[in-house]
Swiss-Prot record:
Transmembrane segments: none annotated. Its EC number is 2.3.1.1. GO terms for cellular component: cytoplasm. Belongs to the acetyltransferase family. ArgA subfamily. CDD domains: AAK_NAGS-ABP, NAT_SF. It is an enzyme of class 2 (transferase). Pfam families: AA_kinase (PF00696), Acetyltransf_1 (PF00583). It is found in: Cytoplasm. It comes from Buchnera aphidicola subsp. Acyrthosiphon pisum (strain APS) (Acyrthosiphon pisum symbiotic bacterium). Pathway: Amino-acid biosynthesis; L-arginine biosynthesis; N(2)-acetyl-L-ornithine from L-glutamate: step 1/4. This is Amino-acid acetyltransferase. It catalyses: L-glutamate + acetyl-CoA = N-acetyl-L-glutamate + CoA + H(+). InterPro entries: AceGlu_kinase-like_sf, Acyl_CoA_acyltransferase, Asp/Glu/Uridylate_kinase, GNAT_dom, NAGS_kin, NH2A_AcTrfase.
Amino acid sequence: MKERNTELVQGFRHSVPYINAHRGKTFVIMLGGEAIKYGNFYSIINDIGLLHSLGIRLVVVYGACPQINTSLKEKNIKIIYHKSIRITDLASLEQVKQAAGKLQLDITARLSMSLTNTPLQGANISVVSGNFIISQPLGVDDGVDYCHSGRVRRIDKNAINCQLNNGAIVLIGPVAVSVTGESFNLTSEEIATQVSIELKAEKMIGFCGNQGVINDEGKIISELLSNDIKNIIKKLEKKGDYISSTVRFLKGSIKACKSGVNRSHLISYHKSGALLQELFSRDGIGTQMVMESAEKIRGASINDIGGILELIRPLEHKGILVRRSREQLEIEVDKFTIIEHDNLTIACAALYPFFKEKIGEMACLAVHPDYRNSSRGDALLKKIKMNAKDMHLKRIFVLTTQSIHWFQERGFILVDIEVLPESKKKMYNYQRGSKILMIDVI
């Protein structure tokens, strides 16, 4: 029990920066019909209620594809798609309305639950739906009439913001009205994308059957830049219509990112708590799509000294790194390069040039324990080499007692102390006995 309580306290403390960062921001959450149909759906709804209680402005856009298909099959109505978009004739439209209407009531009812001993106890959430979306027909494509399948014409963002300002969750379904008084069936991905853009949302969040976007090795891709998503989409499209909703979300995320939405996230509807893990932990659990990476390699400034000290102090205590005082770091901070992930310094290294000998020392290489099995050390080494080349240095050397093999695997060779610059030779600590390794700057 004690360990469990400790984990709870630590987890809560680690989430506080994200709670503060998200408060007052607008998130658009897209719940596809597959996510609603799955058994974990009520857990997702509870987590949405939790986000609301933390002061996050929420728009929930839901789809109903599998529910509509079930209704159509029961009525013996033919299911027709063209380019992954449903052909919605009048008979199909009636089933679309019924399925979407039922889900609206079900979601509203679940978010309204406030019984004792339930996750939403005392939440008292207001859920508002309305004619926030004005639609228009898709028309005819390649001779195929989409009938009552439509697209977004405009969004009443003022009405949505009014409800959000009043503390309500705005719930938007796949059926939207038109200026002619007709109803049209829209994809939830398009609605979520357009709403995110119009509201200038901080995040657009979608759910899928996988943990996120999976690479060819079956591993989760934690971050995608918008330019890389296109290649992923091409691969996914070859796999067929069963993943077309994921493809549409990824296409929407490109548009959203380019239009000012800070980040889009794709997470699993299978895993309980995935929404919270994605939003309130440093590395998340799914895939996030961004215009610029959340992880940056840059030169350090005086404001980074605290983060650098947190990285190197444990290694100094173990004798792996030579101890540096805060005062020394303040003087030498311009020699440091850091890797920053979501405003946390996760790796650092320094380059001390000896211009007369055209040689540089790479020192103080440190990586956060959570990232040591990644390639951050390699990324720093590459950046240090680039910096050395810009300084017209020809070689880089390191002094190390623990990481000899790591450097050798990357092309460094053991050398004698005589190759060091004279000033460095005079400072060499024979008692410490560090190995000297060197590499040419290419």
